[in-house]
Amino acid sequence: MSPSALEERLEQLESRQAFQELTIEDLNQTVIQHEREISRLREHVRLLTDRLRNQQTSLVAPQSEETPPPHY
């Protein structure tokens, strides 16, 4: 290869590397955002699960408070 061809090839590789570094940084930021969103969603699921459990326990009366069926 001639020196100018080598220099052109080196410039192409440097350009590709710079582009890849930018892409990696963009992907890293996306992963960070997704981690935050997942954490937020997990907290929402936990709160909703707790709320649902509390509602279910309040809807069920203890056996001692249940009225007997009408055929008794």
Swiss-Prot record:
One protein family per Pfam: SlyX
Polar residues bias locations: 54-66
Gene3D superfamilies: 1.20.5.300
Matching InterPro entries: SlyX (IPR007236)
Domain of life from the UniProt record: Bacteria
Renumbered residue ranges of the record's region Disordered: 53-72
Stated family: Belongs to the SlyX family.
Name recorded for this polypeptide: Protein SlyX
The organism of origin for this protein: Pectobacterium atrosepticum (strain SCRI 1043 / ATCC BAA-672) (Erwinia carotovora subsp. atroseptica)
